[in-house]
A protein has these predicted regions:
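Zn-dependent metallopeptidase/amidohydrolase metal-coordination segment
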Residues: 257-277
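A non-catalytic alpha/beta surface segment that caps or lines the substrate-entry region
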Residues: 48, 52, 58-111
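Sec-dependent signal peptide cleavage junction
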Residues: 20-51
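Extracytoplasmic/secreted proteins, especially bacterial periplasmic and envelope-associated proteins
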Residues: 45-55, 68, 72-79, 147-154, ...
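C-terminal motif of bacterial Sec signal peptides marking the signal peptidase cleavage site
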Residues: 15-18
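Acidic/histidine-rich catalytic neighborhood of metal-dependent amide-processing enzymes
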Residues: 137-237, 262, 266-267
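Sec-dependent signal peptide recognition
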Residues: 4-12
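Solvent-exposed loop/turn segments at secondary-structure junctions
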Residues: 60-61, 90-93, 111-112, 122-126, ...
Length: 277
């Protein structure tokens, strides 16, 4: 989680730019959609992937756990697709320390132009500055860092079993949570360094996706997903679609129709740097 924190009972499921349908409204009979067999999402597998990350310990950039977990994630994704790459770039964090950024990208059906983007951050916070005790110690990040990645690895497993009609890119952003605990003031934003870098240097030239979803802190007990401000601005159509499907499946208590303020997270930079309306 980043600059503007939500109350603890909220999670961050936010949406990236969604292309709009600019055709005039008219009564046209749409062809019936062909039924698609959807593989079952295994929640136990997703939780296992979270546990495997936590077992490496804190995973803030340049730490031992970060290096080991990054290697694990790359190896794991390569079992599901041969199109796995890394973005490595030297950076300097707010505290003056030098690091090498490590974004991890896995693509499915890379030649397909019709694509969606799924992303999460894989690093963890280097200080527990929102806890009441041991604030100078790093966190394990089971929820904040591990949960979104766990879900995406399980989705990668499913995508490897059945080719999708559309292409899918999974991006695990680094250094999302290595921001200044005291705030950035008027200086550059010290959070979300991985998404800022990717937004200025996408892994393919002229990158485009129909829409994207960022998963962050999605494993909280009694989680509530709301209509976050920036997501309403950039992807209202996808918000409605996802919430409608969630309610149809019986998950309405988690996907609530409540508008909440905009937050600064990785989706902010993906939207503003890549998918500007």
């Amino acid at each position: 989680m980043t600059i503007k924190q939500l109350p603890q009972y909220f999670v961050c499921l936010v949406f990236l730019w969604a292309c709009s349908d600019n055709n005039p409204t008219q009564s046209v009979k749409k062809p019936e959609k062909e039924a698609v067999e959807v593989p079952d999402f295994n929640a136990d597998s997703a939780y296992l992937y979270i546990q495997q990350q936590v077992d490496f310990g804190p995973r803030f950039i340049s730490s031992k756990g970060w290096q080991q977990c990054g290697d694990f994630l790359v190896k794991k994704l390569k079992t599901y697709t041969r199109y796995v790459e890394e973005q490595n770039h030297p950076i300097k964090t707010y505290d003056g320390k030098s690091h090498t950024l490590r974004n991890i990208i896995a693509s499915f059906s890379p030649k397909k132009n019709n694509r969606i983007l799924l992303c999460a951050h894989w690093d963890t916070r280097h200080v527990a500055d929102h806890d009441v005790e041991r604030q100078n110690e790093p966190i394990l990040g089971a929820n904040d860092g591990g949960s979104g990645v766990g879900v995406l690895i399980e989705l990668a497993r499913l995508l490897s079993k059945q080719e999708s009609r559309i292409g899918v890119d999974i991006i695990l952003f680094d250094a999302e949570d290595y921001g200044n605990p005291n705030g950035d003031g008027k200086g550059p934003i010290s959070w979300c360094i991985g998404s800022q870098y990717w937004g200025n240097n996408p892994h393919t030239t002229d990158y485009y996706a129909q829409y994207g979803i960022l998963l962050d802190m999605v494993a909280a007990k009694d989680a509530r997903f709301t209509h976050e401000g920036l997501s309403r601005t950039y992807a209202q159509r996808i918000l409605k679609k996802v919430w409608s499907e969630a309610h149809r499946l019986g998950y309405g208590s988690y996907f609530v129709y409540q508008s909440t303020p905009q937050i600064i997270d990785d989706h902010y930079f993906v939207n503003t740097l890549i998918f500007q309306p």
